Amino acid sequence: MSGQKNAPLNVAIYCRVGFSEYALEIQKQRAAAVIREHDDWNLATIYTDFGTGPQFNRRPSFKMMMADCRKGLIDKILVRSISTLARDTWSCMKVLRELSALGVTIRFLDENVDTETDSQWMEFLNFYSALSAIWREEIGAAETSDIVPVIQ
């Protein structure tokens, strides 16, 4: 042991919001607070996509974040929720596998899942994203059905 300290982790924050500046600030503040809890974490940058929808090709900040990960500039990403990253299981797992291959870990704050420390993260995320997809389909079906709720 040489007594040298490891270099701090370069941690990025990824936020995606519809159009609410307030929701964005809450996401940023919450993730920044997590970074401050770790002396060996350095805030690298904050990537923010507004009202871009679930497709990755419509998210310029997401694409920039992935490019920075491929360049080795990011060690860890903090995201509010799995659904902030991806809305379907296949897309979520594709991104997580690429990040894992690059040595980049990701921490989902709402679900309290960290790919660095949770050995069962892939199984959990598969299950969670599948449930989220079913939930979104149910909501979409209810919104487009001919059933009109009765309000009393």
Can you say where each PLM-predicted feature lies in the sequence?
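Short, structured surface patches at the beginning of a domain
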Residues: 1-151
